[in-house]
Amino acid sequence: MFVKSTIQFRWRAFDTYSAPPGARVDPRNAFFAGNGPVSDQKITNRSEREIVGWLTDTRPARELLLEELRLPADTYAQASITDPLIEKDRRQPPGDIDLIFVPDARRAIAIQVKRMRVIAETTHKDRTPGRQLGNITRLVEQANGSRAIGFCENYALVLIECYGPERAEYNFISRGPSPGVFRRIYHITKDQPIHNDVGLIFVEITQPTRSNVDQSGMVAVCMDKPAIPLDQSPGITARVRQLIAHRPSM
Protein backbone atom coordinates (compact mmCIF):
# COMPACT_ATOMS: atom_id res chain seq x y z
CA MET A 1 0.00 0.00 0.00
CA PHE A 2 1.33 3.47 -0.89
CA VAL A 3 1.00 6.08 1.84
CA LYS A 4 1.47 9.71 0.86
CA SER A 5 3.30 11.88 3.38
CA THR A 6 2.81 15.61 3.75
CA ILE A 7 5.24 17.66 5.77
CA GLN A 8 5.19 21.36 6.49
CA PHE A 9 8.18 23.70 6.82
CA ARG A 10 8.22 27.06 8.52
CA TRP A 11 10.72 29.38 6.87
CA ARG A 12 12.37 32.77 7.00
CA ALA A 13 14.29 34.63 4.34
CA PHE A 14 16.74 37.38 5.20
CA ASP A 15 18.80 39.95 3.34
CA THR A 16 21.02 42.76 4.62
CA TYR A 17 22.27 46.10 3.45
CA SER A 18 25.37 47.62 5.04
CA ALA A 19 25.95 51.36 5.32
CA PRO A 20 28.16 53.47 7.59
CA PRO A 21 26.51 55.22 10.55
CA GLY A 22 24.61 58.30 9.49
CA ALA A 23 24.65 57.42 5.80
CA ARG A 24 21.49 57.84 3.75
CA VAL A 25 20.03 54.58 2.48
CA ASP A 26 19.33 54.66 -1.23
CA PRO A 27 15.56 54.07 -1.58
CA ARG A 28 16.21 52.35 -4.89
CA ASN A 29 18.11 49.57 -3.12
CA ALA A 30 16.10 46.39 -3.54
CA PHE A 31 16.23 43.55 -1.05
CA PHE A 32 16.07 39.89 -2.12
CA ALA A 33 17.23 40.85 -5.60
CA GLY A 34 20.70 39.32 -5.50
CA ASN A 35 22.46 42.64 -5.88
CA GLY A 36 24.56 42.41 -2.71
CA PRO A 37 28.35 41.99 -2.64
CA VAL A 38 29.59 38.80 -4.30
CA SER A 39 31.40 36.27 -2.11
CA ASP A 40 33.42 33.23 -3.13
CA GLN A 41 32.24 31.42 0.01
CA LYS A 42 29.71 28.68 -0.66
CA ILE A 43 27.59 27.23 2.09
CA THR A 44 28.29 23.75 0.74
CA ASN A 45 32.02 24.22 1.40
CA ARG A 46 31.59 24.77 5.12
CA SER A 47 32.28 21.93 7.53
CA GLU A 48 29.45 20.25 9.38
CA ARG A 49 30.69 21.78 12.63
CA GLU A 50 30.68 25.26 11.08
CA ILE A 51 27.16 24.90 9.75
CA VAL A 52 25.83 23.61 13.09
CA GLY A 53 27.36 26.70 14.69
CA TRP A 54 25.66 28.79 12.01
CA LEU A 55 22.29 27.44 13.15
CA THR A 56 22.72 28.94 16.60
CA ASP A 57 24.65 32.07 15.58
CA THR A 58 22.20 33.20 12.88
CA ARG A 59 19.13 34.77 14.42
CA PRO A 60 16.44 33.62 11.92
CA ALA A 61 17.68 30.01 12.10
CA ARG A 62 18.02 29.97 15.87
CA GLU A 63 14.58 31.51 16.41
CA LEU A 64 12.87 29.04 14.07
CA LEU A 65 14.55 26.05 15.69
CA LEU A 66 13.68 27.21 19.21
CA GLU A 67 10.08 27.88 18.17
CA GLU A 68 9.73 24.39 16.68
CA LEU A 69 11.13 22.92 19.91
CA ARG A 70 8.78 25.19 21.93
CA LEU A 71 11.69 26.67 23.86
CA PRO A 72 12.23 30.21 25.20
CA ALA A 73 14.34 32.58 23.12
CA ASP A 74 17.01 32.77 25.84
CA THR A 75 17.55 29.00 26.04
CA TYR A 76 21.18 27.97 26.55
CA ALA A 77 22.70 26.47 23.40
CA GLN A 78 26.07 25.00 22.54
CA ALA A 79 27.47 23.02 19.63
CA SER A 80 30.04 20.22 19.37
CA ILE A 81 30.31 19.12 23.00
CA THR A 82 32.27 16.20 24.36
CA ASP A 83 33.42 17.04 27.89
CA PRO A 84 31.68 16.91 30.34
CA LEU A 85 28.69 15.22 28.68
CA ILE A 86 30.40 12.21 27.09
CA GLU A 87 32.58 9.84 29.08
CA LYS A 88 36.13 9.71 27.75
CA ASP A 89 36.19 5.92 27.59
CA ARG A 90 32.86 5.56 25.77
CA ARG A 91 33.16 3.12 22.86
CA GLN A 92 29.67 3.44 21.38
CA PRO A 93 28.10 6.31 19.44
CA PRO A 94 27.78 9.18 19.90
CA GLY A 95 31.34 10.42 20.24
CA ASP A 96 30.02 13.92 20.91
CA ILE A 97 26.80 15.91 21.04
CA ASP A 98 26.42 18.03 17.91
CA LEU A 99 24.01 20.50 19.48
CA ILE A 100 22.38 20.87 22.87
CA PHE A 101 19.62 23.12 24.14
CA VAL A 102 19.16 23.47 27.90
CA PRO A 103 16.01 25.29 29.08
CA ASP A 104 16.59 23.65 32.46
CA ALA A 105 19.42 21.45 33.74
CA ARG A 106 16.92 18.63 34.27
CA ARG A 107 15.67 18.94 30.69
CA ALA A 108 18.60 18.79 28.28
CA ILE A 109 17.74 18.37 24.59
CA ALA A 110 20.47 16.55 22.67
CA ILE A 111 20.50 16.87 18.88
CA GLN A 112 22.64 14.84 16.49
CA VAL A 113 23.11 16.36 13.03
CA LYS A 114 23.83 15.02 9.56
CA ARG A 115 24.27 17.58 6.81
CA MET A 116 23.49 16.92 3.16
CA ARG A 117 25.04 19.13 0.48
CA VAL A 118 22.97 19.97 -2.60
CA ILE A 119 24.30 22.05 -5.50
CA ALA A 120 21.78 23.41 -7.99
CA GLU A 121 23.57 23.06 -11.34
CA THR A 122 20.67 24.30 -13.46
CA THR A 123 17.08 25.34 -12.96
CA HIS A 124 15.94 21.72 -12.78
CA LYS A 125 19.08 19.69 -12.02
CA ASP A 126 20.68 19.05 -8.62
CA ARG A 127 23.95 17.43 -7.63
CA THR A 128 24.61 15.80 -4.26
CA PRO A 129 28.42 15.47 -3.91
CA GLY A 130 29.77 12.22 -2.52
CA ARG A 131 27.84 9.28 -1.13
CA GLN A 132 25.89 11.34 1.37
CA LEU A 133 22.53 9.62 1.15
CA GLY A 134 24.00 6.42 2.56
CA ASN A 135 25.22 8.12 5.74
CA ILE A 136 21.85 8.55 7.45
CA THR A 137 22.38 5.28 9.32
CA ARG A 138 25.22 6.86 11.28
CA LEU A 139 22.98 9.78 12.28
CA VAL A 140 20.30 7.44 13.63
CA GLU A 141 22.89 5.43 15.58
CA GLN A 142 24.13 8.64 17.20
CA ALA A 143 20.64 9.89 18.06
CA ASN A 144 19.65 6.51 19.51
CA GLY A 145 22.94 6.57 21.45
CA SER A 146 22.10 9.97 22.94
CA ARG A 147 18.88 8.48 24.25
CA ALA A 148 20.81 5.59 25.82
CA ILE A 149 23.09 8.06 27.62
CA GLY A 150 20.07 9.50 29.42
CA PHE A 151 19.14 12.94 28.05
CA CYS A 152 15.58 14.15 28.52
CA GLU A 153 14.86 14.66 24.81
CA ASN A 154 16.79 13.38 21.82
CA TYR A 155 16.63 14.32 18.14
CA ALA A 156 18.09 13.37 14.80
CA LEU A 157 18.39 16.46 12.61
CA VAL A 158 18.88 16.19 8.86
CA LEU A 159 20.36 19.46 7.61
CA ILE A 160 20.08 20.04 3.86
CA GLU A 161 22.21 22.90 2.59
CA CYS A 162 21.81 24.15 -0.96
CA TYR A 163 23.86 26.50 -3.11
CA GLY A 164 21.28 27.86 -5.52
CA PRO A 165 22.44 30.89 -7.57
CA GLU A 166 21.96 28.87 -10.77
CA ARG A 167 18.22 28.92 -10.07
CA ALA A 168 17.98 32.67 -10.72
CA GLU A 169 14.84 32.07 -12.83
CA TYR A 170 13.05 31.25 -9.57
CA ASN A 171 12.31 33.79 -6.87
CA PHE A 172 14.60 34.20 -3.87
CA ILE A 173 12.89 31.67 -1.61
CA SER A 174 12.51 28.94 -4.25
CA ARG A 175 16.15 28.20 -5.04
CA GLY A 176 16.59 25.34 -2.62
CA PRO A 177 16.84 21.60 -3.34
CA SER A 178 14.42 20.18 -5.87
CA PRO A 179 11.40 18.24 -4.55
CA GLY A 180 12.86 15.02 -5.95
CA VAL A 181 16.09 15.32 -3.97
CA PHE A 182 14.23 16.12 -0.77
CA ARG A 183 11.85 13.17 -1.26
CA ARG A 184 14.81 10.81 -1.55
CA ILE A 185 16.41 12.18 1.60
CA TYR A 186 13.11 12.11 3.48
CA HIS A 187 12.19 8.53 2.64
CA ILE A 188 15.71 7.20 3.23
CA THR A 189 15.61 8.81 6.67
CA LYS A 190 12.14 7.51 7.52
CA ASP A 191 13.21 3.97 6.63
CA GLN A 192 15.91 4.00 9.33
CA PRO A 193 15.46 2.24 12.71
CA ILE A 194 15.09 5.41 14.75
CA HIS A 195 13.89 4.79 18.31
CA ASN A 196 10.26 5.61 19.05
CA ASP A 197 11.32 8.16 21.68
CA VAL A 198 13.77 9.97 19.36
CA GLY A 199 12.45 12.95 17.42
CA LEU A 200 13.22 13.92 13.83
CA ILE A 201 13.84 17.41 12.44
CA PHE A 202 14.55 18.54 8.89
CA VAL A 203 16.31 21.85 8.25
CA GLU A 204 17.00 23.48 4.87
CA ILE A 205 19.55 26.28 4.53
CA THR A 206 19.73 27.87 1.09
CA GLN A 207 22.25 30.34 -0.30
CA PRO A 208 20.07 31.77 -3.10
CA THR A 209 22.61 34.25 -4.46
CA ARG A 210 26.37 34.66 -4.64
CA SER A 211 26.31 36.87 -1.57
CA ASN A 212 27.60 35.30 1.65
CA VAL A 213 24.87 33.27 3.34
CA ASP A 214 25.63 35.14 6.57
CA GLN A 215 24.14 38.23 4.91
CA SER A 216 21.53 36.79 2.56
CA GLY A 217 19.74 33.46 2.68
CA MET A 218 16.74 31.33 3.50
CA VAL A 219 16.23 28.83 6.31
CA ALA A 220 13.32 26.42 6.79
CA VAL A 221 12.58 24.05 9.67
CA CYS A 222 10.21 21.09 9.89
CA MET A 223 9.49 19.22 13.11
CA ASP A 224 8.60 15.91 11.47
CA LYS A 225 8.39 13.94 14.71
CA PRO A 226 8.56 15.42 18.23
CA ALA A 227 10.74 13.60 20.73
CA ILE A 228 9.08 11.88 23.67
CA PRO A 229 10.45 13.37 26.92
CA LEU A 230 12.14 10.89 29.24
CA ASP A 231 13.18 11.03 32.88
CA GLN A 232 16.68 12.44 32.56
CA SER A 233 19.30 10.47 34.45
CA PRO A 234 20.75 12.15 37.58
CA GLY A 235 24.25 11.63 36.19
CA ILE A 236 23.46 13.56 33.00
CA THR A 237 21.76 16.32 34.99
CA ALA A 238 24.92 16.75 37.05
CA ARG A 239 27.04 16.92 33.88
CA VAL A 240 24.66 19.42 32.30
CA ARG A 241 24.89 21.64 35.39
CA GLN A 242 28.66 21.52 35.03
CA LEU A 243 28.41 22.47 31.34
CA ILE A 244 26.17 25.49 31.77
CA ALA A 245 28.11 26.73 34.80
CA HIS A 246 31.49 26.92 33.06
CA ARG A 247 30.83 27.51 29.37
CA PRO A 248 29.26 30.56 27.77
CA SER A 249 26.05 30.26 25.79
CA MET A 250 26.27 30.65 21.99
Predicted regions and their residues:
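Conserved catalytic cores of phosphodiester-cleaving nucleases, focusing on short active-site segments
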Residues: 99-101, 107-123, 146
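Short, charged/polar, low-complexity loop and linker segments
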Residues: 126-127
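Nucleic-acid nuclease catalytic cores
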Residues: 134-211
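Charged, low-complexity C-terminal accessory regions
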Residues: 28-32, 184-250
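Acidic-basic catalytic patches of nuclease active cores, encompassing PD-(D/E)XK
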Residues: 2-96, 102-105, 117, 249-250
